[in-house]
Amino acid sequence: HSDAVFTDNYTRLRKQMAVKKYLNSILN
């Protein structure tokens, strides 16, 4: 199911972005 794969990748991408924002907020 390509839709499920897209959702999984999107969720993973969102998590990575959230982690980067979190780290930036700590470091700055």
Swiss-Prot record:
Gene Ontology CC: extracellular region; neuron projection
Coiled-coil regions listed in the entry: none
UniProt keyword list: Amidation, Hormone, Secreted
Similarity comment: family membership: Belongs to the glucagon family.
Highest rank taxon of the organism: Eukaryota
Gene Ontology molecular function: neuropeptide hormone activity; peptide hormone receptor binding; type 1 vasoactive intestinal polypeptide receptor binding
Location(s), subcellular: Secreted
Gene3D superfamilies for the chain: 6.10.250.590
Pfam families, alphabetized: Hormone_2
InterPro entries reported for this sequence: Glucagon_GIP_secretin_VIP, VIP/GHRH-like
Lineage: Eukaryota, Metazoa, Chordata, Craniata, Vertebrata
GO biological process: adenylate cyclase-activating G protein-coupled receptor signaling pathway; epinephrine secretion; mRNA stabilization; positive regulation of protein catabolic process; prolactin secretion; regulation of protein localization
Protein name: Vasoactive intestinal peptide
Annotated organism of origin: Capra hircus (Goat)
Signal peptide interval: none
Modified residues (Asparagine amide): N28
SMART domains: GLUCA
